[in-house]
From Swiss-Prot:
Family of the protein in this entry: Belongs to the fructosamine kinase family.
Species assigned in the record: Thermus thermophilus (strain ATCC 27634 / DSM 579 / HB8)
A GO term, aspect molecular function: ATP binding
Binding site for ATP: A79, Y80, L81
Keyword Lipid biosynthesis: no
Purpose: Ketoamine kinase that phosphorylates ketoamines, such as erythruloselysine and ribuloselysine, on the third carbon of the sugar moiety to generate ketoamine 3-phosphate. Has higher activity on free lysine (erythruloselysine and ribuloselysine), than on ribuloselysine and erythruloselysine residues on glycated proteins.
Catalytically driven reaction(s): N(6)-(D-ribulosyl)-L-lysine + ATP = N(6)-(3-O-phospho-D-ribulosyl)-L-lysine + ADP + H(+); N(6)-(D-erythrulosyl)-L-lysine + ATP = N(6)-(3-O-phospho-D-erythrulosyl)-L-lysine + ADP + H(+); N(6)-D-ribulosyl-L-lysyl-[protein] + ATP = N(6)-(3-O-phospho-D-ribulosyl)-L-lysyl-[protein] + ADP + H(+); N(6)-(D-erythrulosyl)-L-lysyl-[protein] + ATP = N(6)-(3-O-phospho-D-erythrulosyl)-L-lysyl-[protein] + ADP + H(+)
Transmembrane segments: none
Protein name (record): Probable ketoamine kinase TTHA1179
Taxonomic superkingdom: Bacteria
Phylogenetic classification of the source organism: Bacteria, Thermotogati, Deinococcota, Deinococci, Thermales
InterPro entries: Fructo-/Ketosamine-3-kinase, Kinase-like_dom_sf
């Protein structure tokens, strides 16, 4: 949908032209004055509502995110955050505080990783929760493209994953979903659920982009136990299956390396 038409549907007044912004592989994104408008070509039902719920969940837990002005099946209208200087130490403080929070139980509403639908799930033992809610749907979707790696992926989760306690997660925390606003570090495009912080740490490590100073400050504020470090490749398998699904078999090498390191 045209961004100006979406603003009209939302009952919001455009304050200037629609200027394209980088929107990644899923959405088309524009700045229109004080608003950011996101749309997508034939989005799966519930995509933008899930994003809005995730932003609200992070905001309720003290994370800076763009305010949601309107959400519908066609798109999402957010507040535009003025850019500011990089503040990796501030980001480390934000994420350490988020990951230190303890929730009542593991919990995921039906949602998405990118545009891939994920089921809801609540409670239970962590390894089963993570495997059945996150890994298994992607494993089933990519099985025929894994060149025999499927059984090796299954075997990874027959050993328990370490459990520090249920914590709120961004859920898709690569460096492109970090935004340094004038007011301080902000997070974008969450795939929010309550799980173990190793999931976020694994995605941050997978594609890099987080400098040494970030990791130093995060580690000072919330040290990462050795058993969590050792589990990161098993969490990375989740994201690499998603990359095989979206982008093809070029990611099988990285998937094999994560399996081998597990």
């Amino acid at each position: 949908m045209d961004p100006l038409a979406l603003l009209r549907k939302a009952g919001l007044e455009a304050e200037g032209p629609a200027l394209p912004l980088h929107g990644g592989d899923i959405s088309r994104v524009w700045r229109v004055g004080r608003f950011v408008v996101k749309t997508a070509q034939d989005p799966p039902p519930g995509l933008f509502r899930a994003e809005a719920r995730g932003l609200q969940a992070l905001a309720e837990r003290g994370v800076r995110v763009p305010r949601v002005h309107w959400v519908g099946e066609e798109g999402l209208v957010l507040a535009y955050l003025e850019p500011g200087p990089e503040d990796w130490e501030g980001l480390a403080r934000t994420l350490a505080a988020l990951h230190r929070r303890r929730e009542g139980s593991y919990l995921a509403e039906p949602g998405f990783l990118g545009t891939f639908p994920l089921p809801g799930r609540e409670g239970g033992e962590w390894t089963a929760f993570f495997y059945e809610r996150c890994v298994l749907p992607l494993l089933e979707a990519t099985w025929d493209r894994l060149q025999g790696l499927g059984p090796k992926v299954e075997a990874l989760y027959q050993r328990p994953l370490p459990a520090e306690g249920p914590a709120p997660l961004h859920g898709d925390l690569w460096h492109g979903n970090v935004y340094f606003a004038r007011e301080g570090p902000a997070l974008l495009d969450p795939s929010f659920f309550v799980g173990e912080r190793g999931v976020d740490l694994a995605m941050m490590r997978l594609f890099g982009g987080f400098p040494r100073r970030f990791w130093e400050v995060y580690g000072e504020l919330y040290p990462v136990p050795e058993e969590v470090e050792r589990a990161l490749p098993r969490y990375q398998v989740y994201y690499l299956l998603a990359h095989v699904h979206f982008f093809g078999q070029g990611y099988l090498g990285a998937l094999w390396r994560a399996i081998s390191a597990s």
